[in-house]
Amino acid sequence: VLIFAQTTTYVDALYNILEEIYPSDVTRYHSQVKPERRKKQLLFDFLQGKRKIMIATSAFSMGIDVPDIELVVHFNAPISMTDYIQQIGRAGRDGRKAHCVLFYDQNGDDDAISNSFIKKTKKQSPKVAKVIKAKLSQVHDFIHSDSCMVCDILEYQGQHETKTCKRCTVCAQKRRNSK
């Protein structure tokens, strides 16, 4: 299981909660884990299967190849569609079945985190803040879309697919509502 959280604070909070429930199965990975040797050991434990649950920021998704991840959970909305696609791509390797879950609180922390991030960035670079705002807008559009999620992801990547997957949350909800 791979759980992504938007901030190191969320990673640590989730780790503390899950560590109580699954004491020897949980690990975490983010930039504030020190020393570097400890961070490498935590990663190694997960990659070797000694720990079954990894809670991490987006830094974890780049270049990590774990063949048997069956579930990717986003505790917060990712900052961009590119991040989202990169992170869900950690699951279902080599044709294996996997699931991805995205939790989103539109009236709470997710929008607050996004707005705070944009505000901090705007002070340093208004141009970068504008790009980040556009990327966050794409994620919000994806979350609120009533189209097949797979089709939306493919379209974001420049492919056009008219046949729905019939398995994503949106397709399943439409199927239930049509009965």
Please tell me what each predicted stretch does.
Residues 1-123, 161-163:
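Helicase motor core with emphasis on the C-terminal RecA-like subdomain
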Residues 24, 120-179:
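C-terminal accessory/connector segments of nucleic-acid motor ATPases
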